[in-house]
Amino acid sequence: MKFKFFILISLFFSLHTQATLSINDSNSKLNFYPESNEINANSENILTIEISMDKGWHTYWINPGDSGDPAEFEWELPEGFQISGPIWPSPDKIPFPPLMTYGFDDQVILPFILKTPKIIPKQFEIGLKANWLVCKEICIPQSGSGKIKFPYQNVNALSNDQLKEIKTRTIQKINLKKFKVISDKNFE
């Protein structure tokens, strides 16, 4: 009996940590996670792309600097659905003298906002085609594609802690004490 219970618990946790869509390439892995297991009509949902690189490798920011290319994402959406993003976090400086580039070492998390129409089908697919560049001493193009079906089963979405971490890493706080009003005149 204990053995059966152990198997059930192991199966639950293996499904609990499974990503919706994973794309493995030579020096990196892309995971695609939805905000929740359910996407409702007339709502905004967060879809998250996580790119993890092998140790010592990096990928590029939207403005890569002197060299490199940012990741590109092509979405296949049902009729009436719209997607915006990614919401880029602040990059790290990646010097490669005499060049200066901007990007992310080891991992980057990129949220997208999916807007749904007032009426959505009971079942639908979201397709993703991704291209990104990973570099160490040389750069290697990475790519992959796939689809996820909604509603889907046996897949866990992001936890509240993971969502909080994504928002913390991508949305910068502004210190309003550093700003000063120098004129109350209207600007034209």
Please report, for each region that a protein language model flagged, where it lies by residue.
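Sec-dependent N-terminal signal peptides
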Residues: 3-15
